[in-house]
Amino acid sequence: MNFLIKPLAAGLYFVATPIGAARDITLRGLDILATADLIAAEDTRTARKLMEIHGVPLNGRKVVAFHDHSGESAVARLISDIKGGKSVAYVSEAGTPLVADPGYELGCAAIAEGLDVISAPGPSAVLAALTVSGLPTDRFAFVGFLPAAKEQRKTEIASLRDVPFTLVFYESPKRVGEMLANLREVLGGDRQAVVCRELTKKFEEVSRGDLGSLADAFAGRQVKGEIVVLVGRAGAQDVADIDVTQALRDAMKTMRVKDAATVVAGALGLPRRQVYQIALGLGDEE
């Protein structure tokens, strides 16, 4: 493969890598990996394998480990390299760095030193899961991993009960059954949800339904692979509530039906299409 080989300016380059299918990496990501003076990786073996698959030569360049337990000295060394004029590419084990992956402290340190921080965007399990979920994507909140301890997990779920966004979680395959049971217990069994497993991989699986049915389906099931759990936003089941109707009536005094529906849906965190249908009904009453 022909790479665009040209000197990179000194800086920190965050490069997104595939979450499963190796061919999902971007051409720009490969160009940066082929050109950077130094490559830092959460898992050096995974990084080397990815480069080998795509024929990216190292040509004597180093691939150094950098992960959550690397410590301040590792951050200082990489910052020193960049200040010395080097381009440093950073890759996490899979997906986009910093999104439930290492890199935050390194990025903050580079910014604090006035160094350039550049993103080479690409694969993300969060966005891939949202894309196939069938849940609203106009507003979402990425929660990441919930606490492993049951009571702490339930407390955090309770704090998210009224958030009017689609919620996105990562979870261990060993805990997903218990997590879904906790979600059902705290949020109720009627909330729509999706469990995505092994996205972009050979055994990709997307399970859709309400929390009640999904909790039953995964109870006691032996699950393998990477898991993303999505939960529909609060309020979606109550779109006909009197508060929505009154908000629409107030908005429609000064706005067109379509504009009023858009404003009210955004303010209340509800699907615009459903609010628009209610607005049309109110318009017919007049």
Regions found by a protein language model. Name each.
Residues 1-66:
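Glycine-rich, flexible N-terminal cofactor/catalytic loop recognition
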Residues 9, 87, 166, 173-286:
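A contiguous loop/helix-start segment that scaffolds small-molecule binding in enzyme catalytic cores
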Residues 11-15, 85-92, 140, 165-169, ...:
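Generic beta-sheet signal
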Residues 33-39, 114-118, 166-167:
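Short active-site oxyanion
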Residues 41, 92, 117-122, 169, ...:
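General beta-strand structural signal in soluble alpha/beta enzymes
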Residues 65-72, 146-149:
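Conserved helicase motor
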Residues 98-113, 180, 184:
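Short Gly/Thr/Asp-enriched flexible loops that form oxyanion-binding sites at enzyme active sites
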Residues 105-163:
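Class I SAM-dependent methyltransferase SAM-binding "motif I" and its flanking Rossmann-like core
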